[in-house]
UniProtKB/Swiss-Prot annotation:
Phenotype for residue 178 to Q: Abolishes enzymatic activity
Effect of residue 180 to V: In CAND; <1% residual enzyme activity
Organism annotation: Homo sapiens (Human)
Effect of residue 204 to H: In CAND; 12% residual enzyme activity
Native organism taxonomy: Eukaryota, Metazoa, Chordata, Craniata, Vertebrata
Subunit structure: Homodimer.
Protein name, UniProt field: Aspartoacylase
The protein's role, per its UniProt record: Catalyzes the deacetylation of N-acetylaspartic acid (NAA) to produce acetate and L-aspartate. NAA occurs in high concentration in brain and its hydrolysis NAA plays a significant part in the maintenance of intact white matter. In other tissues it acts as a scavenger of NAA from body fluids.
Cofactor: Zn(2+)
Annotated CDD domains: M14_ASPA
Length: 313
């Protein structure tokens, strides 16, 4: 018999989150649709729960009410004593943790798909938090293969000092899905179709896995975050240069030392320094102006996964 890495157990509980950011409308629209008619997301033997994560922000069509829901799922915020004085999103995070967690427990949901849009030209993107997770690498390989020839990129946010504390991190297997470009507060049919297909293929993978299909060893190309880059700023902290036209919409493309990065209003080009080629992502993302992030630098690498098969009882 072929030796293989056996994944822990079959997958039982899956959640699909929309509206973690209330103005990213593809996930909101799909989740609302699936709450009314969820036939397309159901798979035999699998509990799939669509869920609106930040209903107040969705109602106002804004990213958040008090603070970013997708950055506060750490033990400090989840452990705060519940009171009306807490920011709305912290209270909501505790409610979500109660419903789908608790985080880092045996009772937490197996998989959470968190649906997002970006204003950046990132196409279909899967966000991975753990480079050693054979199950998710296999799932992402399946999704990428199923979507081809449509490109699907994998963004690895594993980093020693950049801690995200994402909404989906309460699950055993957290999956971020990011599709763009799409303006905030807008629905685009092409973007919706791409996100819908990503979810379909992900659920198909889980179904095949649960039925005992063995997935042979595989490898995927990923883009691992190195650092986030702020806009150049003046002495008052105001933005002093904008994304250069040569960099705009060039997510995932190589940016070499000396290539144009920013452009000042008086026409001066600010190039990339250093001696390493990087791959920019979230270029000129609207939501990241407040976070002082013009783009993120990534490096390209390959992740390998062992063969996996479900432990059938």
């Amino acid at each position: 018999m072929t030796s293989c890495h056996i994944a822990e157990e079959h997958i039982q509980k899956v959640a699909i989150f929309g509206g973690t950011h209330g103005n990213e409308l593809t996930g909101v629209f799909l989740v609302k649709h699936w709450l009314e008619n969820g036939a397309e997301i159901q798979r035999t033997g699998l509990e799939v729960k669509p869920f609106i994560t930040n209903p107040r922000a969705v109602k106002k069509c804004t990213r958040y009410i008090d603070c970013d829901l997708n950055r506060i799922f750490d033990l400090e915020n989840l452990g705060k004593k519940m009171s009306e004085d807490l920011p709305y999103e912290v209270r909501r995070a505790q409610e979500i943790n109660h419903l789908f967690g608790p985080k880092d427990s045996e009772d937490s949901y197996d998989i959470i798909f968190d649906l997002h849009n970006t204003t950046s030209n990132m196409g279909c993107t899967l966000i991975l938090e753990d480079s050693r997770n054979n199950f998710l690498i296999q799932m992402f390989h399946y999704i990428k293969t199923s979507l081809a020839p449509l490109p699907c990129y994998v963004y690895l946010i594993e980093h020693p000092s950049l801690k995200y504390a994402t909404t989906r991190s309460i699950a055993k297997y957290p999956v971020g899905i990011e599709v763009g470009p799409q303006p905030q507060g807008v629905l685009r049919a092409d973007i919706l179709d791409q996100m819908r297909k990503m979810i379909k293929h992900a659920l198909d993978f889980i179904h095949h896995f649960n039925e005992g299909k063995e997935f042979p060893p595989c490898a995927i190309e990923v883009y691992k975050i190195i650092e986030k880059v702020d806009y150049p700023r003046d002495e008052n902290g105001e933005i002093a240069a904008i994304i250069h036209p040569n960099l705009q919409d060039q997510d995932w493309k190589p940016l070499h030392p000396g290539d144009p990065m920013f452009l000042t209003l008086d026409g001066k080009t600010i190039p990339l320094g250093g001696d390493c080629t990087v791959y920019p992502v979230f270029v000129n993302e609207a939501a990241y102006y407040e976070k002082k992030e013009a783009f993120a630098k990534t490096t390209k690498l390959t992740l390998n996964a062992k063969s996996i098969r479900c432990c059938l009882h």
